[in-house]
Amino acid sequence: MSQSILTTRIMEALAAGRKALIPFLPGGFPDKERFFDELAALDAGGADIIEIGVPFSDPVADGPVVEQASLDCLLNGTCLSWLFYELGKRKGQYRAGLVLMGYYNPFLQYGLEQLAADAADAGVSGFIVPDVPLEESGPLREALDKHGLDLIPLVGLNTSEERLAAYAQNARGYVYFVSVLGTTGMRESLPTEVKERLTAVRRIFNVPVALGFGIKSPEQLYAFGDLVDGVVFGSALIAHIKAGGTAAEFMARWRG
């Protein structure tokens, strides 16, 4: 199988002497009309990968900022079929690789084979599913594999080396390292043990490492040096847009 477009985008960023930028934005936020304007602005502003959140009524891994934004999107009528239709109309317009991040129940209800086929047709390159354990990910992984889509593993501070090795066997695209215990959201500082665990992740995985959950500023990212290839930021971006800002302004800050 050829190298994932997600891996390629991260490697291109590293070759340019910078970390890969991976913004997260809930599908349909801040509203269904403006969402694609902000998506285009993220892409034009230098995003290497864009994670699009699929709204769900019980987002167990999300902090208050992302959770409220997702609930607002649900109330506005955001759903998978709408996302696929609208993304499909814009297929090929984005340089950034597109990843859908969502919970397993809506994906199961949609049908895993149909999910993978429609995602590929819409220009999506991968999925992150926080509530699917490794042992139960087989059917989803098989459906995604058929269409050349990546299932991005989520690992963190409490993931044992044995389990890291199990995730690494099938890892494609990149590995998402959860930098804190708990839900998403901005933190002023990150736990000191993050570097130690990242060292193990770097040793065990053969795909790029992206750091997320709790990232507030570029300075936090660069403190990790070569242990990290990219950064995922969601809560800070959402808060910026809610306060009247734009994705373009936010990306300019991260690009420096």
Swiss-Prot record:
Pathway: Amino-acid biosynthesis; L-tryptophan biosynthesis; L-tryptophan from chorismate: step 5/5. It catalyses: (1S,2R)-1-C-(indol-3-yl)glycerol 3-phosphate + L-serine = D-glyceraldehyde 3-phosphate + L-tryptophan + H2O. The keyword Lyase applies. Pfam families: Trp_syntA (PF00290). Keywords: Amino-acid biosynthesis, Aromatic amino acid biosynthesis, Lyase, Tryptophan biosynthesis. One of its GO terms (molecular function) is tryptophan synthase activity. PROSITE patterns: TRP_SYNTHASE_ALPHA. GO terms for cellular component: cytosol. InterPro entries: Aldolase_TIM (IPR013785), RibuloseP-bd_barrel (IPR011060), Trp_synthase_alpha_AS (IPR018204), Trp_synthase_suA (IPR002028). The active site is at residues 51, 62. It comes from the Bacteria. Its EC number is 4.2.1.20. NCBIfam families: trpA. Tetramer of two alpha and two beta chains. Belongs to the TrpA family. The alpha subunit is responsible for the aldol cleavage of indoleglycerol phosphate to indole and glyceraldehyde 3-phosphate. This is Tryptophan synthase alpha chain. It comes from Solidesulfovibrio magneticus (strain ATCC 700980 / DSM 13731 / RS-1).
